[in-house]
């Protein structure tokens, strides 16, 4: 029997389907294709670099050279007290080659032209370039700018230009002995260039650069070796170019006129000890020092010792007055006399002279008798105090200390001869400095080549009253009856002293070789300028200090007073001599 059921199966609800992200077959294909193309491009580029441009890139890489170039510090400028430039450094270029990198030598025509431009023989150039192991060899230093441009136009490979600085001396011979010169690397060799080297030089810098074969800088590279240069210090000297010019010209005229071996002049500021002028002849051009010999380069005013002759007498007279060993009224017997077997005499015999007469007539007898009133040790100490036998520390290299033998070794006659300038030696600059003890009211001043901002401290040698008395006595030397009338300057009272010394040659005093000296100051009451002149071995028109060194002294003193704007201290004569402005 068939039974019908009322049951109906119950339908379960449909599960909600989670939508999965759809991945596009097209997009996948695109990405894969892009990657494939990229790799294919890289492979192709690699093949291209290896096959097509390898030689080109290799050549470009070979053409790039990393170098560390010096950045030269600019050397300090040297100028006179008024700003006239005496030494300066200007940019220049130097040429070097890199033989190690050269694939082939320059052509014969290129070498010939290069030889003409740099003034180096072709054979020398070829020998330099054939040194294949070298990566640096100088061809020519410090080329003229026009020449450098012409060399660049040759297009030579592995020839490189290096920036440098070249020293120039605009005044040429005029300041040669004071300034000196540098070598080609800019290092001081003589004069103030040497003594002030540390101040003038500064500190070079460095820069790492990339150069091409022609030496052109392609790029500057960052490097811990890079350093900026520190320029040198500018120096202002005490010298006055106007006075220096005057002194140099008058000195040369005198040396030529008297057919002398050499000459020297020193001009000091009598109040400060500053050197206003210092000149020697013969001289040289510091721009071409290699053409000068040792005689031309020698700064005689500082390095050469001379016996001062009678120019030392004012100090002996001053010492006697200062110590109360004499006075202006005393008359001394000035007849010739002997010390042991050695005679002491004057050029002209005077029976007796007072102190003024001893100064005016330049009496050896009178001066030696004043010196004899002191012990040898006391006179030795006195000369030493004046700076004889002592370095001045002027700042100039090679300065002499002079010569003063120990008093214990003096023979009886030597104390006498020293009183009139024989047996002791000093430089002309030392002698001029000693005169500051008279011009600065008894105080010995230091000398300086650099301009002084503050008045220097000196050392007292005499009482102020003594210095003034001696200055007054020295005016008589340039007045009628004195030995130095040739040095008189119109409109001024000039205090001066002449000196004539026979030269010591081969162990004896020569009869025909002399040093003529004239030294003095003006105005006498309030001195502003000291001038000292020596003419070495005059052979024509006389040899006495007053005759030979007096005329250039007169011109230099008169001109210096005029240049400095110092007014005359007494009426001018009708025949007043015109002095340079």
UniProtKB/Swiss-Prot annotation:
Pfam families given in the database record: PBP_dimer, Transpeptidase
Membrane topology: Single-pass membrane protein
Record has rRNA processing as a keyword: no
Coiled coil: none
Gene3D superfamilies given in the database record: 1.10.150.770, 3.30.450.330, DD-peptidase/beta-lactamase superfamily, Penicillin-binding protein 2a (Domain 2)
Catalysed reactions listed for this entry: Preferential cleavage: (Ac)2-L-Lys-D-Ala-|-D-Ala. Also transpeptidation of peptidyl-alanyl moieties that are N-acyl substituents of D-alanine
GO annotation terms (biological process): cell wall organization; division septum assembly; FtsZ-dependent cytokinesis; peptidoglycan biosynthetic process; proteolysis; regulation of cell shape; response to antibiotic
Gene Ontology MF term list: penicillin binding; peptidoglycan glycosyltransferase activity; serine-type D-Ala-D-Ala carboxypeptidase activity
InterPro entries linked: Bact_Transpept/Beta-Lactamase (IPR050515), Beta-lactam/transpept-like (IPR012338), FtsI_transpept (IPR037532), PBP_dimer (IPR005311), PBP_dimer_sf (IPR036138), PCN-bd_Tpept (IPR001460)
The protein's Enzyme Commission number: 3.4.16.4
Keyword set includes Hydrolase: yes
Subcellular location: Cell inner membrane
Pathway per the UniProt entry: Cell wall biogenesis; peptidoglycan biosynthesis
Enzymatic class: hydrolase
Residue ranges crossing the lipid bilayer per the database entry: 28-48
Active site: 310
UniProtKB keywords: Antibiotic resistance, Carboxypeptidase, Cell cycle, Cell division, Cell inner membrane, Cell membrane, Cell shape, Cell wall biogenesis/degradation, Hydrolase, Membrane, Peptidoglycan synthesis, Protease, Septation, Transmembrane, Transmembrane helix
GO cellular component: plasma membrane
Homology family: Belongs to the transpeptidase family. FtsI subfamily.
Job description of the protein: Catalyzes cross-linking of the peptidoglycan cell wall at the division septum.
Free-text comment about domains: The enzyme has an N-terminal penicillin insensitive transglycosylase domain (formation of linear glycan strands) and a C-terminal penicillin-sensitive transpeptidase domain (cross-linking of the peptide subunits).
Protein name: Probable peptidoglycan D,D-transpeptidase PenA
Origin organism lineage: Bacteria, Pseudomonadati, Pseudomonadota, Betaproteobacteria, Neisseriales
């Amino acid at each position: 029997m068939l039974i019908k059921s009322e049951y109906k199966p119950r339908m379960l609800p449909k599960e909600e389907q989670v939508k999965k992200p759809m991945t596009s077959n097209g997009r996948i294909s695109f990405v894969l294709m892009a990657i494939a193309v990229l790799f294919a491009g890289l492979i192709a580029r690699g093949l291209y670099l290896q096959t097509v441009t390898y030689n080109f890139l290799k050549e470009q890489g070979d053409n790039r050279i990393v170098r560390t170039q010096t950045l030269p510090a600019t050397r300090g400028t040297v100028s006179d007290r008024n700003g006239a430039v005496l030494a300066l450094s200007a940019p220049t270029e130097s040429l070097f080659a890199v033989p190690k990198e050269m694939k082939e030598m320059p052509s014969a025509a290129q070498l010939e032209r290069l030889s003409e431009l740099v003034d180096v023989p072709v054979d020398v150039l070829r020998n330099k370039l054939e040194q294949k192991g070298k990566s640096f060899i100088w061809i020519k230093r410090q080329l003229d700018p026009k020449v450098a441009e012409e060399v660049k136009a040759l297009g030579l490979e592995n020839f490189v230009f290096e920036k440098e600085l070249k020293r120039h001396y605009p005044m040429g011979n005029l300041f040669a002995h004071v300034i000196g010169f540098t070598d080609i690397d800019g290092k001081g060799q003589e004069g103030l260039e040497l003594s002030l080297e540390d101040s003038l030089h500064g500190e070079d810098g460095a820069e790492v650069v990339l150069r091409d074969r022609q030496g052109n800088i392609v790029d500057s590279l960052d490097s811990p070796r890079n350093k900026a240069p520190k320029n040198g210090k500018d120096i202002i000297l005490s010298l006055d170019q106007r006075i220096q010019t005057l002194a140099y010209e008058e000195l040369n005229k005198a040396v030529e006129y008297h057919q002398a071996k050499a000459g020297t002049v020193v001009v000091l500021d009598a109040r400060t000890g500053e050197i206003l002028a210092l000149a020697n002849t013969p001289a040289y051009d510091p721009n071409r020092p290699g053409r000068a010999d040792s005689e031309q380069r020698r700064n005689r005013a500082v390095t050469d010792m001379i016996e001062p002759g009678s120019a030392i007498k004012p100090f002996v007279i001053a010492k006697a007055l200062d110590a109360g060993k004499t006075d202006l009224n005393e008359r001394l017997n000035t007849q010739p006399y002997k010390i042991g077997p050695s005679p002491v005499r004057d050029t002209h015999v005077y029976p007796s002279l007072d102190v003024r007469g001893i100064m005016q007539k330049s009496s050896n007898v009178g001066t030696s008798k004043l010196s004899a009133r002191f012990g040898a040790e006391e006179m030795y100490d006195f000369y030493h105090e004046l700076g004889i036998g002592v370095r001045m520390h002027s700042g100039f290299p090679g300065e002499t200390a002079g010569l003063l033998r120990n008093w214990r070794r003096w023979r009886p006659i030597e104390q006498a001869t020293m009183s009139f300038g024989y047996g002791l030696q000093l430089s002309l600059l030392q002698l001029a400095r000693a005169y500051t003890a008279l011009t600065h009211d008894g105080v010995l001043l230091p000398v300086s080549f650099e301009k002084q901002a503050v008045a220097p401290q000196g050392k007292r040698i005499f009482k102020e009253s003594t210095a003034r008395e001696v200055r007054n006595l020295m005016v008589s030397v340039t007045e009628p009856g004195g030995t130095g009338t040739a040095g008189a300057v119109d409109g001024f009272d000039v205090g001066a002293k002449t000196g004539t010394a026979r030269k010591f040659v081969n162990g004896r005093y020569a009869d025909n070789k002399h040093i003529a000296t004239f030294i003095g100051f003006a105005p006498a009451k309030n001195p502003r300028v000291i001038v000292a002149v020596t003419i070495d071995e005059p052979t024509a028109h006389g040899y006495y200090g007053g005759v030979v060194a007096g005329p250039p002294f007169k011109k230099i003193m008169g001109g210096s007073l005029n240049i400095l704007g110092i007014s005359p201290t007494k009426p001018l004569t009708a025949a007043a001599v015109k002095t340079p402005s």
